[in-house]
Amino acid sequence: MEQQRIEVVGKLGSTYGIRGWLRLYSSTEQAESIFDYQPWFLKIKGQWQPIELESWKFHNHELIVKLKGINEREVAQTLANVEIGVNLSVFPLLDEGDFYWHDLIGCQVVNLQGYAMGVVSEMMETGANDVLVVRASTKDAFGKKERLIPFLYEQVVKRVDLSSKTIEVDWDAGF
């Protein structure tokens, strides 16, 4: 059987009411898009466990969910702050030049002059554009520990090769 690759898409929050409902914090671009990705898995004691969504709704601008088999507040409390994941295979294919953040994290970033600037450790959303957070190697010639490089495809980011986990950028190594 093929190993499942799980990506975190949200987190359960505190309980709501006495019948097992929980607040939900979605990491998807549109909060309610989290419900498009099924089935869900919960990370309990370091292991991904499948869970079935019974119902969801908005309440006072918050998302709340009811999970199948969770009918009491006390049981729901044990799931507070638990991460929600989905199998990567349920994500839609993207257009050319679009990438999922989880695919970019871990990529080596090299500028046009061939200088290895570091490895993408995380991504940031700024409103205007996404930003690569690049952790520099300890032997960085410019003394940098971290670089913030805007993910502007074609302008700054010239090439992304996911097979070799390499991102080529038009960016001065001194920044």
Swiss-Prot record:
CC per GO annotation: cytoplasm; ribosome
One term of GO molecular function: ribosome binding
Keywords, ordered alphabetically: Chaperone, Cytoplasm, Ribosome biogenesis, rRNA processing
Localization per record: Cytoplasm
Disulphide connectivity of cysteines: none
Signal peptide: none
GO biological process: ribosomal small subunit biogenesis; rRNA processing
Domain of life: Bacteria
Domain PRC barrel: residue ranges: 96-175
Predominant location category: cytoplasm
PANTHER family linked: RIBOSOME MATURATION FACTOR RIMM
Similarity section: Belongs to the RimM family.
HAMAP family per record: Ribosome_mat_RimM
NCBIfam families: 16S_RimM (TIGR02273)
UniProt free text on domains: The PRC barrel domain binds ribosomal protein uS19.
Complexes and interactors: Binds ribosomal protein uS19.
Biological role stated in the UniProt entry: An accessory protein needed during the final step in the assembly of 30S ribosomal subunit, possibly for assembly of the head region. Essential for efficient processing of 16S rRNA. May be needed both before and after RbfA during the maturation of 16S rRNA. It has affinity for free ribosomal 30S subunits but not for 70S ribosomes.
Protein name: Ribosome maturation factor RimM
Native species: Histophilus somni (strain 129Pt)
